[in-house]
Amino acid sequence: VIAAATVGGILLATVTLYGILGGADFGGGLWDLLAGGDRRGHAPRQLIDESITPVWEANHVWLVFALVIFWTAFPVAFASVMTAAALPLWLAVGGIVLRGAGFAFRKEVSGLGLQRAFGAVFAFSSLLTPFFMGTVIGAVAAGQIPADASHASLAAWTNPTSLLIGFLFVGACGYLAAVYLIGEAARRGNRRLQVYFTRRAQAAGAATGALSLATLLELHAPAPALQHNLTGRALPLVILAGLTGLTVLALLAAGRPRGIRVLAALGVAAVVWGWGVAQYPALLPGTAVTLSNAGAPHSTLVALVVLFAAVVVLIGPSFGLLFALHGRQLLQGGEGLTAPAGGRAGAGSPARPRRSSGQPGRASRVVAIGLIAAGAVARARARGGRNR
């Protein structure tokens, strides 16, 4: 039981990391979509591009890790979720692929029409991907995933709770991105873009808070136990999420943005962990599937804990170095955005394309392959134990 709970906590931690890092990337695409025409949206899009370019692919490491843990540690629940929510999952995967392709190829083409087309693919995929991810989480939280799912279910992810959580995911991504971009604009000394993204952070923060409250109220019918736990044992985390959100909005209104990145990330993390604490020990609410009775053999769970420790030791410092270099603007290929820019640019296209920045990195692929291989080894070990 302890091993299963530990692995469940690790799974939630990786989901949290993907949410606060990868979610901000999706939010950048959302603001790219809403930036306006060529001239009006030129400066915001350039800042978004310069902020995302060095780190946009690396954040998916956490998604791969989360999927490997879920598949290896809790195969029954994994199979049910992947079967019942197959359509939104495939749409989310397709969105990730199209988003990456649009982001990379818009740097490689020279025609204005193609730049606009790839920019639109990047922007719309950034909107749809978190939405469909949210509907899957909503299907789980609302108890719409059966324990023995044998076919895809449209009703599982199109109910009001799932749709609300889908919109909540989009709002949270936009909120995180706007808050992070305020700091990026400040680092470049661009006061106009600071004000620009401050307004958007305030709007996205208010919308996300309203959606969170609406979701909490909506859970009364489909998942009363989850709602009860959110207002019970998980209440401190719910309060923390609300307080951090209100503090960020207050600091933005006062023109004192120092520390808002940490507060915004903490608020989103509190929401994720509040859900996890409220749902514990159920993996699939409404069924008998729990962390303890649906987990892999003990040896497999221990192997996953060791794997996570290795990931922290090997990948953690690398991510720290990556973000440190990015924070000091040492990964930029040019001078960066230091003043409001003008001129013509394709929708969603950077003003100064940097071809090398858009290329997929080898490191992320190596890490992903390694994690999948480790998961396969753990599964093989588990099967060997059963055969003996």
Give the role of each language-model region.
Residues 55-125, 224-232:
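Membrane-interface helix-loop-helix modules in multi-pass inner-membrane proteins
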Residues 357-388:
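Hydrophobic alpha-helical topogenic segments used for membrane insertion/localization
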Residues 105-260, 273-274:
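Long, contiguous internal "core" modules enriched in hydrophobic/ aromatic residues
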Residues 1-58, 64-67:
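N-terminal signal-anchor module of multipass membrane proteins
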Residues 160-174, 301-316:
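Hydrophobic alpha-helical transmembrane segments
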Residues 267, 326-355:
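Short, highly charged, low-complexity non-transmembrane loops/tails of multi-pass membrane proteins
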Residues 226-236, 294-312:
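Membrane-interface transmembrane-helix boundary segments in multi-pass integral membrane proteins
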